[in-house]
Regions:
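Phosphate-binding and adjacent anionic-ligand microenvironments
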Residues: 253, 289-469
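An N-terminal, well-structured beta->alpha segment
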Residues: 1-61, 67-68, 148-171
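N-terminal small/polar loop signature for handling phosphorylated ligands or for N-terminal nucleophile
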Residues: 43-107, 189-193, 210-267
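Active-site nucleophile and cofactor-binding loops and adjacent substrate-binding regions
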Residues: 72-81, 273-276, 298-299, 320-321
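Short glycine-rich phosphate-binding loop at a beta-alpha junction
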Residues: 41-49, 172-174, 294-300, 337
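Gly/Ser/Thr-enriched, mixed-charge loops and adjacent short helices
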Residues: 107-193, 210-249
Length: 469
């Protein structure tokens, strides 16, 4: 078997279909996963997104699992957080076939243990890779069986039990599904009729009985070729249509989902982006109101405003490395009720510590509807500093460039460092930046925060001059 290091990433398995990933290889991964989880579970739940290659790859994985004597529950088309719901509610390990926001030629597998517990490099992925590279041992016993189960309705009902959407003022909300799985889950969560799900371009939308929302749908047709734009709302180019539609129809807010709908991105009534850090703080405050004094997780790239706001509301902020496996592990250790990342991943204890963009979006809409101010004014409470967003630089030697930055700033009075994840530099005027290597590409990722936009630009320019010099 060829070296699989190119497709086994830090948190999932991902590559170009037909070149790096195909059905025979995926079958081997299914068999290896069955061996990994066999001591703990007799069944595996499998879902897939709308990519052309996903149903076939999911079937191949299921064949590999059953070849080792374990049973399979197929839930069919699903968002990643819907798969996590199935894993959590059934207490089964799971496999989700998706490449998230990557282009159509890609596909991959997100894996979890029972209860939606993460599988990453240190919690099973490295072992899976080794098993497949060495050759999966044959199983001589009876093969497992395959059953099908639709969990979409139960998933929607579970989310609506966590956030009450029925009591607020009536809102008009534009939702851009990006031709991804949000087009599958949003209609059921919000109870939209079949007729209202088409992208008519009209401003009327659909109001669900008991829910005060007019939903204006954009790009709800499931299409893994992403004909309208990439399903990555963190790229500003991919929310231009959403911003324009919000302004056109006079909506109260806009929500965009990525390809597998585990992340959400929000724009306000002006069409202006709301930072994921502000969403993290807003949801944290809502969760702390229910359970005062609880722990909130934030990764080291989220705004410093997040831990400040958490403390002001009686919570305990805990800072972690970037990545879902670190967030989920820290939530388990601390008993945290909620966690947020700069990348618009939001994690909830009551959702098996898994990330769900849908639940975060529901919190934002509930908060908006419970008061009379526009979203821009509501979220201004949670936005304290200016930020650069993530800036990538291609470099020949990541470590050498990191050390050059550290050496430059290390001579300055009052500057402090930490290396929890890459290099974080804290300046005496309150500005700070993080510079960290990509796990999969020859990139350094820079995030800068400071008091205002001018200070952010000056600090960004200074760091990039060293990184790219």
């Amino acid at each position: 078997m060829a070296d699989l290091s190119g497709i086994v990433k830090a948190y999932d398995i991902r590559g170009v279909v037909g070149e790096q990933i195909d059905a025979p290889l995926v079958r081997e991964f299914g068999a290896a996963f069955a061996l990994l989880i066999k001591p703990d579970s007799p069944r595996v739940v499998i879902g897939h997104d709308m990519r052309d290659s996903s149903p076939g790859l999911a079937a191949a994985f299921a064949d590999g699992v059953t070849s080792q004597g374990l049973d399979v529950v197929l839930i069919g088309l699903a968002s990643t957080d819907e798969l996590y719901f199935a894993s959590g509610s059934m207490n089964l390990p799971g496999a989700m076939f998706t490449a998230s926001h990557n282009p159509a030629k890609y596909n991959g597998i997100k894996l979890c243990r029972a209860g939606a517990s993460p599988v990453g490099q240190d919690t099973g992925l490295a072992e899976l890779r080794a098993t497949v590279e060495d050759g999966v041992p044959a199983f001589s016993g009876q093969p497992g069986t395959v059953t099908e189960q639709d969990v979409l309705t139960d998933y929607a009902a579970y989310l609506r039990n966590l956030v009450d959407l029925s009591g607020g003022r009536r809102l008009k909300i534009v939702v851009d599904a990006g031709n991804g799985m949000g087009g599958h889950t949003v209609p059921t969560v919000f109870g939209m009729s079949a007729a209202s799900r088409s992208d008519s371009g009209e401003g009327g939308g659909e109001r669900r009985a008991g829910l005060p929302f007019d939903i204006v749908p954009m790009y709800f047709e499931l299409d893994g070729n992403f004909p309208n734009h990439e399903a990555n709302p963190l790229d500003p180019a991919n929310i231009v249509d959403l911003q324009a539609k919000v302004r056109e129809v006079g909506a109260d807010a806009g929500v965009a989902f990525d390809g597998d709908a585990d992340r959400c991105f929000v724009v306000d009534e002006r069409g202006e982006p709301v930072s994921p850090s502000a969403i993290t703080a807003l949801v944290a405050v809502r969760e702390l109101a229910k359970e005062p004094g609880s722990t909130i997780i934030h990764n080291l790239i989220t705004s410093h405003g997040v831990p400040e706001i958490v403390k002001e509301h009686g919570g305990k902020p805990v800072r972690t490395r970037v990545g879902h496996s670190f967030i989920k592990a820290e939530m388990a250790t601390t008993g945290a009720i909620f966690g947020g990342e700069h990348s618009a991943h939001y994690y909830f204890r009551d959702f098996w510590r898994a990330d769900t963009g849908m639940l975060a979006a529901m919190h934002v809409l509930a908060a908006l509807g419970e008061q009379d101010r526009p979203l821009s004014e509501l979220t201004a409470e949670y936005s304290r500093y200016a930020a650069s967003g993530e800036i990538n630089s291609t470099v020949d030697d990541q470590i050498a460039r990191l050390m050059a930055v550290k050496d430059s700033f290390g001579t300055r009075p009052g500057v402090t460092f930490d290396e929890m994840d890459g290099l974080t530099v804290q300046l005496p005027d309150g500005g700070w930046f993080n510079l960290r290597p990509s796990n999969t590409e020859p990139l350094l990722r820079l995030n800068v925060e400071a008091a205002d936009a001018a200070a952010v630009k000056a600090l960004t320019d200074e760091v990039l001059a060293i990184v790219r010099g």
